[in-house]
Amino acid sequence: MKMGHLYSVSDKALFDALNNSKLTNQEIIDIFFSRGILISKETKRKDLALYFSRLTHGFHDFEFLSEILGTYSRKEKSTSCEIPSTVKKEDVIQAAHELCQKINQEGNTADTNILPNGDIELVVKYKKLNLDKSELRQTVNKEATLIIEPSKTGFTLRTPLNEDANIWKEDLLQKIQEETDTEVEFTEISLEHISDHKLRTEFFTELIKKIGNYELLDVTDAYVYHPKESTSVDSDFDRDDDDEEVDFGIHISKASLKGEGVLQSEELHSLYAKGFYIWRVIWRCKEPAVGSDQIELEAQFAEPESCTEFSYIAKGFYKYKNQGTYSKNRTTLSYSAEKDLLQKLENKARETIREISQKAAEEGNEED
């Protein structure tokens, strides 16, 4: 699956591209020089763009400009999957190599590395088209890193949360299954088996209380969901028109609250009472030591109705200044600090899922 490329654009698009401020004067000189044309720095950019756009152009011109003007994707949320200990490391490595070969054959660039700490890293560089942008800015340069980390229970596969990475993840798991003699069960973090809206909310409130040594400071954003109940009417039953309820077709599925002390707000608790549950949350936490920085985290179920595709991201940290004050600008965490934090978040999420599942089972037994 090659992620589309541009092969031709209009003269107007070329004119606009050469007038774009992202294109430096030196790059303008280079593109003219590639045609054997020398230009003066005194010539106006608009005149140069008008002249060049009238020339005959080829793919290399479009590729040169789209590489400069194309956008780069933002950091994406991560999602993880557990691979059991019955799978051998050499089978995982072989599956990763086979996936790399397949991706490269599709026209993208993929490479597998065994890191010093034992992690298996699969890096994919590819391009996507965003047709909402102007022609020479439609190319989005993307990079997806699939990490397979050895764990006490086997391996943890961590991938970005997007459609392309999900396809590669499924391909990798399929190849691991093919390399293994026995049936392999891959486990993801999910609340699909729990329908109680209170327990779904409890998953998040318990999750964020403490991640490793990081204790909850405040929730800044809470997103809640209320699935629409499917109602079916049996036409064989006679109904009294006077007693029939009127459905006005009004149903609010999603709501969000932002600010300070969101979890304690009356507005959120009133939504709980109506059957809403949390599906996405952004919060800040810190270690108890004096002078610790504030960490901002986000966790969500990408499919809020079924509570599947659990994903998360360490958004960064606010550096401690002095006397209880913190910087206003958020700073990106180092690779090692982020990895350690995400591992702790994953472990806490799985632990919380087990506790919530046990609680749901006990409540079910009481009802029986």
Feature map (PLM): residue ranges:
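Intrinsically disordered, low-complexity, charge-rich terminal extensions
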Residues: M1-G154, T159-D368
